[in-house]
Regions:
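Helix-breaking motifs and short loop linkers at transmembrane-helix boundaries and internal kinks
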Residues: 53, 85, 106-112, 123, ...
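C-terminal transmembrane helical hairpin of 12-TM major facilitator-type secondary transporters
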Residues: 315-364
Length: 433
């Protein structure tokens, strides 16, 4: 009897392995298409601007305005998720944003472009912070580094697979088959799978471990005990959820750190194909394969760093060092544009660092925020970070139109990431879980 009352580490590991295999692969695929739908305009740009006679500034604003809708709807969407349940809300979000993303193939004016990107951002707003909250209700703090790395490796994998796939679509459909240009086919072929995944989410996800029919009673007990221990270690508050969200200085500081990380991430995601093209590569498929290299190495690096953080129970330097790598990589890329091999190496280092900063960041606020602040707080942090998605591409586009080069913008973004790493070191002093 005593053995069943106190499960050993092997038993716990077996339970969490089962939960991981049940949840993470499907959520990974959903996030892969989420990210692909968000950033595939970077490849569409290679043909879209000439077809529609858009300027670089129009593209930058259209790419970035997505995040205005994202920011405005982030907190209410995450609160709705807690009210209606993850299964229903995640399914609804995916069906809506997949439909809107597909409709980008009908764009013919800047107004169409801005409007669809704005509403797509609003539809996607609750997905990522909702999944972070959802996973935190299944996995305790000391297991989240690896889990977040597995989940968020969908970002580099979306680049790894999506870049060559997008390049192939642009080339294969360049003749205008079916009356559609290559960039229109890309939005169609990459948007429809998201709608299908949204329908599947309704049937495959469980709202929580208590309602998961696929778990045995003793497995639920393991999860419940670990969640209770996690809750006991969180800060306590007497304030309402909304009061704590907007009056908690830590939330605003974490939001600023996340903004700095995302400044580098979105600069890379939206401009990597164009930067590689400017290095002298003209074929879209070649650009796609070269764009995949940084994402491949970033995926491996992300998983290794996530594993290291959990094994060492160390968060501080596992967050700050990748952020510094992102800044250094951008500086290398911008200073060696005459040497494509070194420039691509710099972009690879920047991608590895910036993308790895994402999963290393999220275990920190989920461990330090009280239960009352978690849903709204995580959404606010995410919304602040996503403002970088609006500012980064717009600034790069504006600088490119004004100076004919992206160099000045990349210097600025490198400085922002470096400043964020300093703030991260300050905010995480004493955190060892």
């Amino acid at each position: 009897m005593s053995q069943s009352a106190a499960p050993n580490d092997d038993t716990k590991n077996a339970v969490y392995k089962r939960v991981t295999l049940r949840l993470i692969p499907f959520i990974f695929i959903c996030y892969l298409f989420n990210y692909l739908d968000r950033v595939n305009v970077g490849f569409a740009k290679l043909q879209m601007l000439d077809d529609l006679k858009f300027s670089e500034t129009v593209y930058g604003l259209g790419a970035g305005i997505f995040f205005i809708g994202y920011v405005l709807c982030g907190v209410p969407s995450n609160l709705a998720l807690t009210r209606f349940g993850p299964r229903r809300w995640i399914a609804l979000m995916m069906i809506v944003w997949g439909t809107l993303s597909t409709c980008l193939l009908f764009v013919s004016t800047p107004t169409h472009f801005y409007t669809l990107r704005l509403f797509t951002g609003a539809a996607e707003a609750g997905f990522f912070p909702g999944v972070v909250l959802y996973l935190s209700q299944w996995f305790p703090t000391f297991r989240r580094g690896r889990i977040m790395a597995l989940f968020m490796s969908a970002i580099p994998v979306s680049g790894l697979l999506g870049s060559p796939f997008s390049g192939w679509i642009l080339n294969h459909f360049a003749a205008g088959q079916g009356g559609l240009s290559g960039w229109q086919w890309m939005f169609l072929l990459q948007g429809i799978p998201t709608v299908v995944l949204g329908v599947l989410a309704y049937f495959l996800l469980s709202d929580n471990f208590a309602s998961a029919r696929w778990l045995a009673a003793h497995e639920r007990s393991v999860l419940e005990a670990d969640q209770a221990l996690d809750l006991a270690n969180k800060p306590k508050t007497e304030k309402s959820a909304l009061q704590e969200v907007f009056r908690n200085p830590a939330i605003w500081a974490f939001g600023l750190i996340y903004f700095c990380i995302q400044s580098g991430v979105y600069a890379i995601n939206f401009w990597l194909p164009s930067i590689i093209k400017n290095l002298g590569f003209a074929d879209n498929l070649v650009i796609g394969w070269l764009s995949a290299i940084p994402y491949l190495l970033a995926a491996v690096f992300m998983l290794l760093v996530g594993r290291s953080a959990d094994l060492r129970k160390e968060r501080r330097w596992h967050l700050a060092v990748p952020m510094l790598m992102g800044a250094v990589g951008l500086l290398i890329a911008v200073n060696f544009t005459a040497t494509p091999a070194i420039a691509i190496l710099g972009l690879t280092i920047a991608t590895m660092g910036a993308l790895t900063g994402l999963p290393m960041f999220w275990p920190v606020p989920t461990a330090m925020l009280s239960a009352g602040a978690a849903a709204g707080g995580l959404a606010l942090i995410n919304s602040m970070g996503q403002m970088a998605g609006f500012l980064s591409p717009y600034i790069v586009g504006f600088v490119k139109d004004t100076t004919g080069s992206t160099d000045l913008a990349l210097y600025l973004l490198a400085a922002v990431i470096a400043a964020g790493s300093v703030l991260a070191l300050r905010m995480t002093r004493g955190l060892q879980r």
